[in-house]
Amino acid sequence: VPLPPSTWRRLGVDGHDVGGSPVLPAAGWLCLLATAASDAPVGLRRARFLRGVRDAGAPLVLSLDRGRAAVEAGAETCATCLYAGAALVELATCAPTCTYVLDEAGKALHYRRCASVGLRYSAAFECVERVRWFADRSFSVDVRAGTVAALLDAPLQAVCALDALRGATFVPVGVERCELRDAARAPAFAVATGRLTAATDAALACDIALRTRDGTLVATLQGARFARVADARPGAGPGG
């Protein structure tokens, strides 16, 4: 299934960049892979983001084979997943257990932190209203998103910028299980809750649940994994 160059515009990811050059975000890959599902809710397993695509005009192809989906750019595979039934059950790891706030950032501070480690977002993806980190390594994110890709990306942004004070840039590299109630429409307001399940200097992992204002579960990301990348801060590196 050919994906037209307008795909990036439709997902609202024009201008999304890491280290100064545009790149299709992890949430964009999840949405592209979800488009192949015929049932709702959508269940994706073992999603892997293998290679970044930095050319918004690059021809992408979505291929399906016995429950496996892949997005390809030319001869290279960029993202893969398996399909599975979706139950949208509550993730125990995302249940709030602590009320002691260690850190809190409003929208302006959050995006300054992102920019300080080379993470810049188009207007559609500037959807984080507030981020709170708690003493038990859990977090919450208030989200106002116009697209499903932005909705999914909001809590990922919070984790990517977690270590901004040390100048560390993290990017998503995979999700063990992603479930979406509706892959086509995003609620106007949502709250993401999550918890770090692993953290080292080189990698992070977490579970995330997204709910509407009335508490309806709309998406879960279980086993989201992040890797630290080479210094992407503005002006970093030789001659920077």
Regions found by a protein language model. Name each.
Residues 1-240:
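Acyl-thioester-processing domains in fatty-acid/polyketide/NRPS systems
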